[in-house]
A protein has these predicted regions:
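Sec-dependent signal peptide recognition
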Residues: 2-9
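C-terminal motif of bacterial Sec signal peptides marking the signal peptidase cleavage site
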Residues: 14-17
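Bacterial signal peptide processing site
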Residues: 19-21
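N-terminal targeting leaders for non-cytosolic proteins
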Residues: 24-144, 152
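Extended extracellular/luminal ectodomain segments enriched in beta-structured repeat modules
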Residues: 152-159, 228-229
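Short edge beta-strand/loop segments characteristic of extracellular beta-sandwich folds
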Residues: 161-163
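Short coil-to-beta strand junction motifs in C2/discoidin
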Residues: 171-193
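Terminal, low-complexity interaction segments
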Residues: 190-245
C-alpha cells in the first residue's frame, strides 16, 4: 500500500560547482526528450542489480538501476518491483495527458500535466520504506564529480521546482478508494516536503498542502541555505496517517 507521500519534482534543477581556482560553473538538470509517453525506470531487461523478497503474500521481484541526466552529474537510484515503480526511488517521465498508457495502478503524473521547461520531469517516492537490497538507502540524489565520475563532489544547490502528483493531489482533495473521505484534507491538515543536505545537518521545508490549499503548480524551492553538499535527501510528512504510515 502506498502512503500519501508521493510527489513529483525536478522539472528544473539548478546548482553550481566551485573548483579550487574559483572557476564557477552552473549546471541545469538535462533530461531526455522522449518521443512517446514514457515511464523510464532504466534497463528492465539488464538491470544493474536484482533480488527477490518472499513473504506470506508471495514473492516480490526487484530491479535496481542508476539513472543519470545528460551531464552525468545527477545520479538517481531507480527501483522497480513486480508491481511497477517502487515507493522510495526516482524515475523519469514525460506523461502529460489523462490517459497515459502502461502506467501502474497509482498515478505518478504531475498534477500540472507538464514540466517547467519541457515535458520531461523526475518523479520521486519518499515514503520512508528505504530502498536497496540491504534496505540501507534513502531517496537521495547524488552529485558526481564532472571530471571524475567515480567520486562525489560538493556543489552549491540553487534550488528546484516541486509539485504534487495526481495521486497525492486527488487523495487530499477527494480521497481514494482505499480510505475514502478519511484522506480528504481539512483546515488543520498539512503535507510537507523536507529536503536535506547529503549528511542531513541542514534542511529546507516546503509545504505541498496547507489545509485545503493544495499545490497544483510548479513551485520554486530555494536551497541555497544548504550550502555545499554532495547530494540531497528527501522526506515527506503528513497529518494524515494510517497503519502504513
Amino acid at each position: 500500500m502506498k502512503k500519501l507521500s508521493l510527489l513529483l519534482l525536478l522539472s528544473v534543477f539548478i546548482f553550481c560547482g566551485c573548483s579550487d581556482d574559483d572557476d564557477t560553473k552552473t549546471y541545469i538538470l538535462s533530461l531526455p526528450n522522449y518521443e512517446t509517453h514514457t515511464l523510464d525506470m532504466g534497463d528492465q531487461e539488464n538491470p544493474d542489480d536484482s533480488w527477490s523478497v518472499s513473504s506470506e503474500w508471495g514473492t516480490t521481484n526487484y530491479k535496481y538501476n542508476l539513472l543519470t541526466d545528460a551531464s552525468g552529474i545527477f545520479e538517481f537510484d531507480c527501483v522497480s518491483s513486480t508491481y511497477g515503480f517502487y515507493s522510495d526511488s526516482f524515475a523519469f517521465t514525460n506523461c502529460t495527458v489523462e490517459d497515459c498508457p502502461d502506467f501502474a495502478s497509482y498515478d505518478y503524473r504531475a498534477i500540472t500535466k507538464k514540466g517547467v521547461i519541457n515535458n520531461t520531469y523526475v518523479i520521486v517516492g519518499a515514503a520512508g520504506y528505504k530502498i536497496g537490497k540491504n534496505s540501507d538507502k534513502e531517496a537521495a540524489i547524488r552529485f558526481r564529480d564532472h571530471d571524475n565520475p567515480n567520486e562525489l563532489e560538493d556543489y552549491r544547490v540553487k534550488g528546484l521546482y516541486v509539485t504534487n502528483s495526481v495521486y497525492a493531489y486527488s487523495s487530499m482533495k477527494e480521497g481514494t478508494g482505499y480510505y475514502g473521505e478519511e484522506e480528504i484534507f481539512g483546515s488543520n491538515d498539512s503535507f510537507k516536503l523536507t529536503i536535506y543536505n547529503y549528511d542531513k545537518t541542514m534542511h529546507v521545508d516546503c509545504y505541498l498542502a496547507e489545509g485545503t490549499n493544495l499545490l497544483d503548480q510548479w513551485k520554486w524551492v530555494d536551497l541555497t541555505s544548504l550550502g555545499e553538499t554532495k547530494g540531497l535527501k528527501f522526506s515527506l510528512t503528513s497529518t494524515k496517517k494510517n497503519e502504513y504510515g
